[in-house]
Amino acid sequence: MTVRRNSLILGLAGVLCAWAGAVTAGDKPSDRADIGAAVTLQMQTAFNPNLPGSGEAVRTFTKTLKHMSAGALSVKIVEPGRLAPTRDMLDAIISGDLEAAFTWTGYAATKAPVFGLFGSLPFGPGPEEMASWVLEGDGRQIHRAAYDKLGVTGVPCGVQGPKGGGWFRTELNTVADFKDVRLRYGRLSGEVITRMGATLVPLPAGEFFYHLQQGKVDGGEMSTPAMDAALGFDKLGLPYYMPGWQQPSAVLDFLMKRERYEKLPAPFRAQIETACRANIAWTLSRAPHIQALALEKLKASGVVIKQWSPELMD
């Protein structure tokens, strides 16, 4: 663990200690008198709360927020797609049809390409560097300004670790191997593979397993090792390539329409932002553990873990 990572996580741990004291002090009814009636936000998530990693982060954030506010501010989790399609949640926030959302920043790239820097930057920063940039560096202002232009308050609320490199029905060791191969990847990583001769196949995450199983695509990315293992990709009998060059890290956001967010009492807004910082600390510490366990599980089930060749990575 690097000094930089230690400093970042210790700093975020300090945030946890700070609000822990605030919760104790805030348990008294008199301390809540200035914020009015209790509030429950309906928050649709892009991630199944029962899945590891980003799904767990949804539940952790809502529990933290409830404890911090002594129950005055709570969040009702709405399952993916229940009120709005996952990819359209930002539009639903802007229109006011959705009260709050917990999502991947990359979905917002359809509104402004700059969001791709936070959601899926090939060969980009790792999770610790991403967290530092979006919390304390120039990324903080870039992220905020991009959402401001849409009339949305976007609070960084988690940092996902690296994805797996993908599952493939064919060997990919050289640039020539990519010619005419049909692959599922994201927007920016798709530009990389198409330049190498591959055909980009846009597929919703929920359809990738079936298409890969049926041979309708030749391979591509799904998610992190923990997520891939939980979704049963080991049953395909295909090799799993590492590392996930296409997405070394990704920011998760809490979203509300700005005018709606600013109507919340100031203590609630502060608690949301502090709970999100705490959630970033949690995701940074949680990810390496569950990814290592997932890779061991995949190996035990017979999956061959392959490293990308030096020719491709260099």
What are these regions (language model features)?
Residues M1-G11:
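Bacterial N-terminal signal peptides that target proteins for export
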Residues V3-R4, A20-V23:
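N-terminal twin-arginine translocation
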Residues E136-G137:
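Polar helix-capping/helix-linker motif
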Residues G14, T24-M130, R140-D314:
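N-terminal secretory/targeting leader peptides
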Residues W133:
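Short beta-strand-centered segments that line the small-molecule binding cleft or hinge
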Residues L10-W19:
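Bacterial N-terminal signal peptides
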